[in-house]
Amino acid sequence: MILTDTNIFIDFWNNPTEDLKNVFIKEDIAVCGVVRAELLHGAISAKDFANITTMLEAFDEFNLEIPDWQILGDNLYNLRKKGISVPFSDAIIATIALKHGIPIWTGDRHFLLIQSVLTGLNIYQTPNRL
């Protein structure tokens, strides 16, 4: 199982390379609420919105529960103590991945910064993605 970041879906839709196709075929893909919302936010029509919604139904989804918000706050605090500021959405995604012990598939370098402090975070690597 890998938690897939928004940028991977966008890359795949814009340029469906063989390496991306193979991961989508071979791996169990998961999303989280942040990724769902970001993808739906990018819809350009009602049809596009419906297609994205249908596509997302194919994947497992992980989200934060009430106690996890304290953990997210702890993670953000620990990052800030090291002088690292990352987008709030990326911190949520990282916290979800850490909670469930699953790697994040991303092309976003913010996750390397997060990983430098939250060393339990695993990043799923594919060619040309970090």
Predicted regions and their residues:
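Acidic, PIN/NYN-like endoribonuclease modules and their adjacent C-terminal/linker elements
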Residues: M1, P16, L98-L130
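Short, well-structured N-terminal submotif of metal-dependent ribonuclease cores
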Residues: M1-V31, L40-T54
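A secondary-structure boundary/capping signal
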Residues: D5-T6, V35, G107
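A generic structural signal for short hydrophobic patches within well-formed alpha-helices
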Residues: F9, R36-L39, F111-L112
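A generic structural signal for well-ordered alpha-helical segments
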Residues: F24, T54-M55, L79, A97
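General small-molecule cofactor/ligand-binding pocket signal
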Residues: A30, F62, Y124
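Short, hinge-like loop/turn segments at secondary-structure boundaries
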Residues: A46-A50, L79-R80, L121-Q125
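Active-site neighborhoods of divalent-metal-dependent phosphate/nucleic-acid chemistry enzymes
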Residues: E61-R109
